[in-house]
C-alpha cells in the first residue's frame, strides 16, 4: 500500500463494495506454485495446515463413498498429499474395509505424521513399505480393492518416478479398480477421477472446496513470497537479473532510490542512466549529458536497455522527456513505468507494468478510479485489458489494485507514514527487480506486498519520521521472512 498521491486525487477506497469480490476469484487450472502460495496465505489468515488437510481428506473420502465400495486401498507418500490420504482413511473406516500402504523415505510433514499416528486408533489396516518384500507381500490388496486412492505424490513432486512408487503405480494400473487421485495424479497413475483441492491442478481435474478464505486468493500475502525464484547454486553474476533505471533530471534522488530498491529486491546488476551524477559503490552509473534526458540520449538508452532484463523508467524524470521515453520503450523486453513516464499517450515495451497513483491513472485513462473497491478493480482490469495483453497495472492506494486485464488482486499492506515522497520510486525499483525474473502480474502483486510490509516495519521504528530509504533497508528482512 502506497499513499503517495497528487493533490485533489482520490486515494481512499471504500471497502464496502457494491459488487462481490468473489467475482475476482480465478477460474481454471492453477499452477502448483500459485496453489502453495494460496495455502500459505490461508495459514497466515488463521487457517492451519492441519485444518486444510482435514478438509481435503474428508472431501476425498466423500468422493470414494460415491462408489459404495466394500474394499478401498489408499496409497500414500510422506508429504501432505499422503496426509490427505491418511485423513480419508479415517473417514472411510466405518463404511468399508480400508487398507493403507505408505512409504516414508525421511521425515514426514508434521501434519501428515499426526494423522498417521491417529490411524493407530482406527479400524484401518496400515502397511508400511520399507523394502521390495513389503510391497510383494501386499500385492493381493490391489486385486481385492474396489477403489484405489492415489495420495502418493502431490504438487511438489519432482519429475521421474522412483521405487517403490513406480511399482505401486504399476500394480494399481494392472487391476480394474476405480482409481481416484488426490489433487494431482502421481506420474503414470491412470486415474479415472482426479479431485483437486480448492482449484484444479490439471485440465481433467474436478475440484472441491476445502475452506480456504477468499482473501487468501484475491489479496496478496506472505505466501506469495514462495513464488519468487530462488537463486540456484552455481549461478553466475547477472543470473538474478539486470535492471536499468532511466530517470532523474529535475529530481535527482528518485532514480537512485529506485536503483537501491532493485538491489535490495534481489537484482544482481543495477545500472542508472541519468543526468544526475551521484556516487554509490553498489551501483553502475551511466551519466548522461545535460540537465534532462533528451533526444541526444536515444541511441545510448536503447543500447543499455536491450542488454537489460528489465528497464524502470520515469523516476524523477520530469515532463520534458516523455517523447524520448515513448521512442525508446518499444525496444525493451520488460519495462516498469512510474511517475513522469505516466503521461498520455502511454509508452509501451514488449511487456509493461505501470505503477500509477489515482491522479496518474486519471491522466492516462481519462477518469479517476472509483472509490468502491469492486468498481475500482473492474476499472483497473478494463484499462489493463485494453492493451491487448501487454499491460499490467499496479494502482497504488490505501488498497492497491493489480490487474493484467484478466486476473485482479488486491494488496493492503502499508502504513500512513508512506505518504513521504520517494516511496513510489522504491516500489518501482523493487517491481523491476522482481519483473526481471518472473511474470509481470506476479511481480506486481509480490512487489506491492513486500513494499507495504517493509513500510510497516520501517514505520514501526520511525513513525512519521520515516524516509523512503528506510523502506529499502527493510526489504531483505521481509523477503527472507519465514513463511
Question: Which residues does each PLM region occupy?
Answer:
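Small-residue (G/A/S/T)-rich helix-start motifs and N-terminal tracts that mark the onset
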Residues: 2-104, 109, 113, 147, ...
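Generic hydrophobic/packing signal
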Residues: 76, 102, 120-123, 152-156
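Short amphipathic alpha-helices and their capping/turn segments at secondary-structure boundaries
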Residues: 132-143, 339-348
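Short beta-strand elements of ligand-binding domains
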Residues: 181, 337-339
